[in-house]
Each structure stands twice: as structure tokens, then as C-alpha cells.
């Protein structure tokens, strides 16, 4: 499940079935909220839809919002987070190594990735924890803030990055790429009909 936006004023929230490859819920939204996702999942369950698992991005609070359903964080979204923090060509060796490790995520096993992240920390923990002092205020702060953010993002999301391994019988996808592809198709189609009113775009 995910939400895509068409401009700044409106978007579409979609809950998509990876097995039947059809949308179970399509909702016009102005803002993407955890409560709205909860409401839509509950509405589907009330209709008798059995939700075996959920694949979503790492939006704050969303991964923890469904304690009774296996939740897989989209590994592609995790990669985007790391690239946003570290860019394509990090300057420090620690950042280059962490980015390289993150790029193995989609092809790695849970145990191998956790081991790789632990080994990275053992090599670079001192660098990660370096502090600098502000000459004007005298206050200290972490020197490599973006590197810390990237590392802690991986560490924080680890419980949900390999849910598909924990429930092999469910054949859980490890990304929302199927839905992202549908969003891409929608946006390309709407570009061909740029003059349509919003109501017609939703239809």
C-alpha cells in the first residue's frame, strides 16, 4: 500500500493485492496519514478480505500500525533513504562502505545483511561518534550527522526489512515496485490528458 501525489493539492491512496494484481481500495486524499491507512485496512477486513501481509514504505509509525499483520518495509524505499543521506558519491570511506552495503539489500539474506551492518559498525564506530565543537556557542555536536542518520535508519528498520523471510509461506514481496509501476503508468497517462479536471482524472 502507498500514496502518490498529483501536484501539491491531492493524491491517491491505493491498497493493492500483489496476488490478484488488482486494487482493493483507491481513495482520494489530501494528506497521507497513518489513521487513514488503519481505516482502509479495517474497512477491507470488515468486507471479509483476509490481509495476510502488508508491504509499505518506512513512514514514521506506519510499520508499527498493524501489530497483528506481518509488515514488510519496501527495501527500495530504504535504499532511497540511504541515497538521500549519503548521495551517489560519499566522501568518507565509512559512508562509501555503508552505501555499498545498502545496495546489497535487495539481494541479501537477513542474517548476511545484519552481519554486514554489524561489521561496518565495528570498523567505523569511532568515526560515527566523532563530535565537533561550535566555536561560537561552545556546544558539541555529532560531526557526521547524515552518516548517523543513514546508519540509524537501517538499524531502526531492520525488524521490518526481512519480514518476507520470516513468513516464507506467504510469498511476501520485498518491495512495493508493483504498485510503484502502476503509479508511474497513471502519471504517464495523465500527462497525455493534461487538460482534464481532477474529477475526471480520478475516474
Task: Tell me the role of every PLM-derived stretch.
Residues 1-60, 64-68, 157, 178:
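RNase H-like nuclease fold core
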Residues 18, 41-44, 81, 89, ...:
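Short, charged/polar low-complexity linear motifs in solvent-exposed/disordered segments
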Residues 17, 32, 92, 194-195:
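A short hydrophobic/aromatic micro-motif that marks alpha-helical segments and, especially, helix-coil
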Residues 17, 21, 46, 77, ...:
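Intrinsic structural disorder
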Residues 49-60, 66, 99-203:
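Acidic/histidine-rich catalytic cores and adjacent linkers
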Residues 1, 23-26, 48, 84, ...:
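Residues at structural and domain junctions
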Residues 53-99:
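Conserved beta-strand -> loop -> alpha-helix junction used to position metal-binding or nucleic-acid-contacting
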Amino acid at each position: 500500500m502507498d500514496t502518490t501525489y498529483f501536484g501539491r493539492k491531492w493524491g491517491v491512496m491505493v491498497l493493492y493485492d500483489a496476488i490478484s494484481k488488482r486494487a482493493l481500495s483507491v481513495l482520494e486524499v489530501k494528506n497521507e496519514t497513518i489513521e487513514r491507512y488503519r481505516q482502509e485496512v479495517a474497512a477491507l477486513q470488515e468486507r471479509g478480505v483476509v490481509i495476510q501481509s502488508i508491504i509499505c514504505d518506512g513512514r514514521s509509525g506506519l510499520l508499527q500500525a498493524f501489530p497483528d499483520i506481518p509488515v514488510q518495509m519496501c527495501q527500495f524505499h530504504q535504499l532511497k533513504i540511504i541515497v538521500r543521506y549519503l548521495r551517489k558519491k560519499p566522501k568518507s570511506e565509512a559512508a562509501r562502505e555503508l552505501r555499498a552495503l545498502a545496495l546489497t539489500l535487495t539481494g541479501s539474506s537477513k542474517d548476511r545483511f545484519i552481519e554486514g551492518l554489524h561489521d561496518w559498525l565495528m570498523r567505523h564506530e569511532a568515526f560515527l561518534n566523532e563530535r565537533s565543537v561550535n566555536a561560537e556557542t561552545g556546544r558539541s555536536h555529532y560531526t557526521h550527522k547524515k552518516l548517523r542518520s543513514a546508519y540509524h535508519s537501517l538499524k531502526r528498520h531492520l525488524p521490518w526489512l526481512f519480514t518476507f523471510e520470516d513468513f516464507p509461506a506467504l510469498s511476501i514481496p520485498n518491495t512495493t515496485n508493483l504498485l510503484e509501476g502502476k503509479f508511474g503508468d497513471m502519471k504517464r497517462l495523465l500527462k497525455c490528458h493534461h487538460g482534464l479536471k481532477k474529477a475526471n482524472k480520478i475516474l
